[in-house]
Amino acid sequence: MGIGEESTKPIWGSVSHTSSGYALNGKIMLSSVIVLFVAVIMILCFHSYARWLFRRHNRRIRRRIRSHLRTLSASPRDQALDQAVLDKIPIFVYSSKNPPPPEEKEECSVCLSEFEEEDEGRLLPKCGHSFHVDCIDTWFRSRSTCPLCRAPVQPPFQVIETGSSSSSSPLTFPTEGCEREPIDLAGIIVDISREVEFEGSNPGLPIENGSKFPGSRVLSLKRLWSI
């Protein structure tokens, strides 16, 4: 009996040693999982806080730019874009799944901030530049060109050249303002026969009486030529 008891003692000692080792390893694993979980939570909190600060900074910049553009729109010298033209500019919703082409920038040139998820923007048809809806609408209250390239948004008015129109069509002047009417000479007939008879029947008349008639002047000139 004494020999059997002595042989079983080291076996029970090894079992107790291994069980204590498993318990220690379990505690280490549990503590490492807890530390990793806390670290992930802290990283997520820091990321969300940094993103909130970034959005807050962008909002402040947008507000400053809007206030500045409103002051500019108050001046009468600036020409605003027509509301009908502004309504025709397409609006898009930004998504990281469908980013713009690489040659285009993913930021608004008015507020100098990047587009975020589900941000609404306007795409100018001529130059292809994109801006936030609020930023570009505020800009077009005082301007009618692109903020980035200064390209006109609405088509220019058609100007007719005066040189081409004058060469193709003759100039006409209105006759309503004329006080005198044109004289019709078609119905006027000069009768010289009476003047000849009158001068032949009375040859002794002086030249002064005959000079009153235009026919006598013509006959006197003929007589001078015949002489």
From Swiss-Prot:
Write down the EC number: 2.3.2.27
User: What keywords does the record list, in alphabetical order?
Assistant: Membrane, Metal-binding, Transferase, Transmembrane, Transmembrane helix, Ubl conjugation pathway, Zinc, Zinc-finger
Q: Does the keyword Protease apply?
A: no
Q: Does the keyword Transferase apply?
A: yes
Give a GO biological-process term. Answer: protein ubiquitination
A Pfam family: zf-RING_2
Q: What is this protein called?
A: RING-H2 finger protein ATL64
Q: Which gene encodes it?
A: ATL64
